[in-house]
C-alpha cells in the first residue's frame, strides 16, 4: 500500500482545492476536495464516487438506513482546476520570493494560493 518509512508525502492536491476527475465512471466531473489521506494516496471529493452505506438497525432507528456517502478516490485520477482559467492544469513546485517551496501551474507559471 504505502512505504511506512517515508516521512512526509508531498501531494499535488490539498484540502479545499477544486479538482477534475481524469478517469473512471466520474470522468470530467469537478468537485472540491473534502479530505486527503496521504498514506494511501486517496482523497474524498465532493459529489464524486458516491456509494451506498448500510446502517444497522439500532434502538433509535429500528428500521436501519441506507446512506449515500462519498468514498475516497486515488489522487492520480485527480487534476487541479486553475481558478483563473477554470481548466485543469499540471502542478509543479518552485521557490517563491521568500524562499519557500510553493505550488505553481505548469500551464501559466503562476503560483497557486493555498486553501
UniProtKB/Swiss-Prot annotation:
Transmembrane regions: none
Keywords noted in UniProt: Ribonucleoprotein, Ribosomal protein, RNA-binding, rRNA-binding
Care to name a GO molecular-function term for this sequence?
rRNA binding
The record's Gene Ontology biological-process terms are: translation
- SMART domains attached here? KOW
Do you know which Pfam families this protein is assigned to?
KOW, ribosomal_L24
Q: Please give the PROSITE patterns that the UniProt record associates with this protein.
A: RIBOSOMAL_L24
Q: Does the keyword Ribosomal protein apply?
A: yes
Task: Name the source's superkingdom.
Answer: Bacteria
- CC per GO annotation: ribonucleoprotein complex; ribosome
Quaternary organization? Part of the 50S ribosomal subunit.
Family stated for the protein in its record:
Belongs to the universal ribosomal protein uL24 family.
Biological function = One of two assembly initiator proteins, it binds directly to the 5'-end of the 23S rRNA, where it nucleates assembly of the 50S subunit. One of the proteins that surrounds the polypeptide exit tunnel on the outside of the subunit.
| Record-given protein name | Large ribosomal subunit protein uL24
